[in-house]
């Protein structure tokens, strides 16, 4: 599980005619395209560029791992003819109406746009928490296409999606999907360097669904909420100390300072005790290192995935060393069971919701939120 994906309401009307989808090439390695249009100003994203060329939109994704482009998409309304002289790229006729999603993260975003009907297939259905999507799976309105690591090709072919939304990885392909004719929307937002940068990808996805204005408006709300919370916390003179996560086998993995959660903890007004670990992933530490640093921490936040909720008693049964930390002794542990709490599905594109949750824990008088949605105080 990567930390960048932590690692999510508006409505729009999908009014275009029958979707036509044509492929015009794969990944793009050339420099950014120049067309007679307006480049949309990105507020926080460093990997995404959108250019409105009047009759179509060019979306370019920078390669997060090396110089050049990861992909270029050409978004042309299905009600219009394909313009002549467009640059090389993957042609997508918008709005997309028949999509296969590898993650529930994007399904929740579709729903916020009012475009849930565009979700026709998903992978890893057993991990999806959202009741509305589980109901659509049960009714057969959404197809379970198997594991994202071992896709059911027959079901994908039967679905014949307009596009497949999947996460790219360095030097990695999409397995069986690579052999099919369907275009892949490479969802590289998790490689952004900030929570608001990742959330800004909703502006790209909104344009794929014919909801560009809705997405722009929603993103403005996200940024406004986020900045208001961050500003309110910035003036706090007291910043409670924070430890996080659990020991896993021989290592205790904690978010690095530059990871999504590492940034969020600090922006929420906590004195994150592992902030000296730079980088953007998770850092493996020994139990002894964590104990030396965090024995007297004020708060302990952790996430886990289990069919049964954990308690301090069950933690102690797993590892007796937990008893040596102050939050264990005084009950100041806040836990999120991601098997039943949609933290990952909802907050990837709504970092303002996650920030509000954390501020409610550390500085409840400042958040304006009375109840916690994702975390619970561990009994």
Question: Can you annotate each of these PLM segments?
Answer:
Residues 135-144, 268-281, 327:
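A local structural motif
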Residues 118-119, 178-189, 312-333:
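A short, gly/pro- and small-residue-rich
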Residues 92, 141, 152-154, 158-251, ...:
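Extracytoplasmic substrate-binding proteins
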Residues 2-12:
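Bacterial N-terminal signal peptides that target proteins for export
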Residues 224-314:
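Flexible, glycine-rich surface segments
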Residues 24-107, 214-243, 329, 342, ...:
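Bacterial Sec-exported substrate-binding components of ABC uptake systems
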Residues 65-157, 164-169:
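A short, structured surface patch at a secondary-structure boundary
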Residues 11-23:
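Bacterial N-terminal signal peptides
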């Amino acid at each position: 599980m990567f930390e960048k994906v932590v690692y999510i309401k508006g409505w729009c009307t999908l009014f275009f005619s029958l979707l036509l989808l044509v492929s015009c090439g794969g990944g793009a390695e050339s420099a950014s395209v120049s067309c007679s249009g307006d480049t949309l100003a990105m507020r926080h994203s460093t990997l995404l560029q959108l250019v409105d060329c009047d009759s179509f939109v060019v979306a370019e994704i920078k390669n997060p791992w090396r110089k050049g482009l990861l992909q270029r998409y050409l978004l042309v309304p299905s009600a219009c003819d394909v313009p002549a002289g467009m640059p090389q790229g993957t042609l997508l006729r918008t709005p997309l109406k028949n999509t296969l999603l590898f993650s529930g993260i994007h399904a929740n975003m579709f729903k916020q746009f009012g475009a849930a009907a565009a979700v026709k297939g998903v992978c890893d259905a057993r991990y999806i928490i959202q009741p509305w999507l589980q109901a659509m799976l049960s009714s057969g309105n959404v197809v379970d296409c198997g594991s994202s690591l071992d896709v059911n090709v027959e079901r994908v072919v039967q679905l014949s999606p307009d596009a497949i939304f999947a996460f790219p990885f360095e030097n990695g392909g999409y397995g069986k999907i690579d052999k099919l004719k369907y275009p892949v929307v490479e969802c590289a937002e998790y490689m952004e360097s900030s929570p608001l940068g990742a959330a800004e990808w909703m502006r790209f996805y909104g344009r794929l669904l014919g909801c560009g204005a809705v997405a722009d408006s929603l993103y403005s709300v996200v940024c406004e909420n986020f900045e208001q919370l961050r500003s309110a916390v910035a003036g706090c003179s007291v910043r409670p100390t924070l430890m996080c996560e659990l020991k896993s086998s021989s290592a205790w993995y904690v978010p690095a300072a530059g990871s999504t959660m590492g940034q969020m903890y600090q922006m929420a007004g906590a004195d994150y005790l592992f902030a000296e670990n730079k980088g953007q992933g998770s850092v493996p530490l020994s139990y002894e290192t964590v104990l030396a640093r965090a024995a007297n921490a004020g708060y302990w936040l952790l996430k886990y995935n289990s069919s049964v909720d954990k308690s301090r008693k069950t933690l102690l049964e797993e590892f007796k060393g937990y008893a040596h930390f102050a939050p264990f002794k005084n009950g100041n542990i806040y836990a999120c069971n991601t098997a039943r709490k949609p933290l990952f599905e909802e907050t990837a594109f709504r970092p303002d919701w996650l920030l509000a949750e954390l501020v409610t824990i550390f500085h409840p008088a400042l958040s304006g939120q009375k109840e916690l949605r994702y975390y619970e105080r561990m009994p």
